[in-house]
Amino acid sequence: MEATAEESVSTLVTTMVDETYEFLAPRWFDFVNGETEDESRRAELWFQSALSCAPSPSVPRIKARRSFKVEAMCNFNEAEEETLKDKEPLEPVVPIVSLQSQPSQAKKAEVAPSKASTVKPSRISSKDAEVNNKTVDASDPTTEPIEDKENIAPACTPKPPMQFSLGAKSVDLKKQQTARKIASLLKNPSTLRPKNQSQAKGSHQKSVKGETNLNNIASTTNLIQENQAIKRQKLDDGKSRQILNPKPATLLHKTRNGLVNTGFNLCPSVTKHTPKENRKVYVREQIAPFVSTAELMKKFQTSTRDLFVQNRPKLTLTRPKEPEFVTSQRARPLRVKSSAELEEEMLAKIPKFKARPVNKKILAAPALPAPQRSTPHLPEFQEFHLQTMARANQHAETSSIASTEVSKQHNDQKHHLTEPKSPVLQTMLRARPTIAKTTAELEQEELEKAPKFKAKPLNKKIFESKGEMGIFCNTKKHITIPQEFHFATDERISRPESVLDIFDKLSLNSESCHEKPLPRNTAPNPFNLKTEERGAEKEKKFYMELMYKKLGDVKARVPKANPYPYTTDYPVVPPKPEPKQCTQPEPFQLESLVRHEEEMRREREERRRMETEEAQKRLFKAQPVIKEDPIPVPEKVRMPLTEIQEFNLHVEHRAVERADFDHKIKEKENQYKRYREESEAAKMVEEERALKQMRKTMVPHARPVPNFNKPFLPQKSNKGTTKAKSPNLRVIKRTERRTMMARPTISAATSASAVHCLMYPGSSFNKLKKKTVLTNIVHCLMYPDSSLLN
C-alpha cells in the first residue's frame, strides 16, 4: 500500500478507575459536597511541587524478575505481508533516524523548514509502519533513502529495533539516556503505550520536542523487547507460529500526562527537558497548560486538512476486538460477601473450646459409703387444744342463772329466713343520683327488646293433604318389576331360525326364487320416548293438583256454623249482628285520564295564547320620524403605543429550580444514608445478640461425677451349651451315591490284581500293591457274599 512516510504524534487519553480507591474513597471523602476552587487549585499545585522518593535499593532485584503481560499476542498480518514483499519489487524506503542525540539538528529543522526534502511514496508494510510510529518522522532533510532489505527481521527471534544513527557518539549518547530511563520504565511499565498503527498520507511538520519524547519511549520499548523470550502460537495442524513484537500490558490508571497518546492530536502534551531531569530519574514531568475546547476547535478548523491519495486499501480479514465501554472503567467491584464467606468469618471469630484433661484422681477415688437410712415410724396425731374451751370452762361457774334463761328463751324461738337488705351507703345520700342500672333492670330491658313471637293458626288442609304440604309422609315403595332390555340390535340383526321353524315353512309347491317383492312406501313409525310419557304424567299430576286446590277453595268459601253450647237452664243465644252498609261504587282513578285532561288543558291555553298574539299583530302603530342617524359612524380610537416587554426566559428561573432540585436530591441521599446506617446498626445489634446467644448455648458444661454405688456385675447365663449338629448337606448324599456306583469296578480291579500277584510274585506291581491285594483277598475269603467277590 502506497503512502507517504509520516508519523502522527498521537496521544491516547483514557482513564482507568482504581477499584481499591473507589471502594474505600467514601469512607474518607464526602462525594455529596462538591469540590471548591481553592481545593482544586491546591490539588493541582501539589503535582508540580511534590517530588517522588529516591530509588529503592531493591530496584536491581525487582528489575531482574520484572515481567510484562502481552496485550496483543501477535500481529497476524506480518507473516502474510512478508510473503507478499518477496514477490513485489523493492523500492526506496524512508530511513528511520534517531534525532534524540542531535539536538542541534532539531533546531535547524525548525529554523529552515523549506529545506525539507519530499519523500518518495513507497510500499510500507504494517510491520514497518508499526516501527515508524515508534520512531521519529522521516521528513528530516538529513535522511537519505536506503534499501528495504535491511529492515527484514529474522524468522527465529523477536524483531530487533530498527534504528540508524549518524555516528558512534550519537549511539552511545542514546544508550546512556535509555539506561537512565530504564529504571523508571521498569518500575512503572504502564507508561509503555501501544501506538496507533495508522498510516498517514501526506507530509505534515511536527514539533521536534514531541518527537524526541516519543523517541525516548520507542527506544525503551525496543530495548525491553530485546530481552523478551521467543513466543509461539499453537495452530490447528500441530504446527507453531512465531509471535513477533509482543506488546506489554498497559495500566491506564498509572500513566502520566506527558506519556499519554491519543489519535486526535489537538493539544499535544509538550514536556520540557531540564538538566535536573537528566540527573534524576524519578522527577515528575510538568503538566500541560490548560486549553479550552473553543481554542481546540478553532485550531482544528483553521489548520490545513490532510490530503489523502485516493488509493484503494488492501482488504484484510476483520479481527474481532472486544469493545471498550466507559462503564467498564466506571463499574466498581462487587464487595458484597456471600453467605458462605460470612459463615466462615463467624466460625473463625468463635472462640475455640478445648476441653481440659480428666483428672485421674476422680476415677481412682474410693466409692462413697452408702447413706444411712433411718427406720420409718408411724405418724403420731395430736389433738387440738383450743383456748376457747378453757375460757368457757373458766367462765361457766361465774355465769348467772338469768343469762341461761335468756339463752333458753332465744333458743326456743322459731328461726326465720334472713331477708336480704341493701346496705345504706354514703353514696346514696349524695345529691346526684346514680346512673348505673341493676342487673334486674338490665334483664327487664333485654326482655322488652326481645321480639315477641306469635304463632300462626294451623292450616287444616295439612291433615287432608297426602304429603304435598305440611308434614311429609313416607309413601310406600312398590316392588321393582324387572323388565327385559330392548336393544335395537335385536331388530337389526335377526336371530338364526331353528330347524322346526324352517320345517314348518316347507311346502309341496316349489316357490320361485327369482320373485322380488314390489317396493312399498315406508310407513313412518314415531318413536315412543320415555320423556314424553313422563311429561304427560307430570301434566296430569299438575292438573289434578289444580283441581284439588279449586275444590279446597270452594269448600273454604262455604261458612261452617258452630253448634250451640249444650245448656239446659239458660241457653246462650248469640246476638244478631248489625247490618253493614251497602258498598258504594267508586270510579277508578286512572293515570291515563289525568294525563288526557292535562293535555287538553294545555292545548286550550296554547290556542288562546296564539289568538291573542295574532290580535296584537293586527293592530297598527306608526313609528316615529327619524331625526338622527340610527347607525352612527364610529369614531377612530387612538390606540396606545405598543409597550415593549422583556422575554420571560426559562434560563432565569431554571438555575433556581435546579438548585432546589439538587437540594432535594441531597436531602434524599442524606435520608437514604441515614436509613442505611440505621439498618446497618440494627443488623449489627441483631448479629451481636445472635452471637451472644450462640456463645451462651455453646458454653461447655461439666458432666456429673459417675455413681459407683451399684457396679456392674455380669451374671451367669441360664442357657445351656450349644450342641453341634452337622448340616444335612446334599454333598454327603452325592458322595455316598458315587461310592456305591464305583464299588463294582473296584472289586474287579482287586481280583485282577490278586491274580496278577499269584502268577507273578516278584513283579514290581506285586511290591507296590502287595498290602492292598492281601487285604482284599482276606476280605473275600471272610465275606464271600460281598461286592468285592463279585
Curated annotation (Swiss-Prot):
GO biological process: cell division; mitotic cell cycle; mitotic spindle assembly; regulation of mitotic spindle organization; spindle assembly
Pfam families on file: TPX2 (PF06886), TPX2_importin (PF12214)
Chain ranges passing through the membrane: none
GO MF: microtubule binding
Record key words, sorted: Cell cycle, Cell division, Coiled coil, Cytoplasm, Cytoskeleton, Microtubule, Mitosis, Nucleus
Coiled coil (residue ranges): 588-619, 656-698
Complexes and interactors: Interacts with AUR1.
Family: Belongs to the TPX2 family.
PANTHER family noted in UniProt: TARGETING PROTEIN FOR XKLP2
Function: Regulates prospindle assembly during late prophase and at the onset of mitosis, before nuclear envelope breakdown (NEB). Is exported from the nucleus shortly before NEB and organized into two polar crescents. After NEB, is progressively associated with the forming spindle. Probably mediates AUR1 activation and localization to spindle microtubules. Has a microtubule binding capability and is able to trigger microtubule assembly induced by RanGTP in a heterologous system. Not involved in phragmoplast assembly, nuclear envelope reformation, and cortical microtubule assembly at the onset of G1.
Name used for this protein in its record: Protein TPX2
Organism: Arabidopsis thaliana (Mouse-ear cress)
